[in-house]
Amino acid sequence: MSRTIFCTFLQRDAEGQDFQLYPGDTGKRIFNEISKEAWSKWMAKQTMLINEKKLSMMNPDDRKLLEQEMIKFLFEGHEVHIEGYTPPEE
């Protein structure tokens, strides 16, 4: 059975995560406040960041950068800036 939460990112009720996807207090906050739809949007941005900045998840500094960008994107309303990327026109 799906959970409905108020998604901080979307600013509306939406389907919540089935389980905690990220460790620690940040993971608990994501589980309680971020919907599946918002998480999917973050995953696309995360993939772009990893590829364009050539981040390695084995490098603690790269993981820290990714976590900071995730928090800014999901909770603070900041767009992820990727040099040279122009979003497609709608």
Swiss-Prot record:
Gene Ontology cellular component terms for the protein in this record: cytosol
Protein name stated in the entry: Probable Fe(2+)-trafficking protein
Assembly and binders: Monomer.
GO MF annotations in UniProt: iron ion binding
Sorted UniProt keywords: Iron
Keyword ATP-binding belongs to the record: no
Protein family membership: Belongs to the Fe(2+)-trafficking protein family.
Function comment: Could be a mediator in iron transactions between iron acquisition and iron-requiring processes, such as synthesis and/or repair of Fe-S clusters in biosynthetic enzymes.
Presence of keyword NADP: no
Gene Ontology terms describing biological process: cellular response to oxidative stress
Superkingdom classification of source: Bacteria
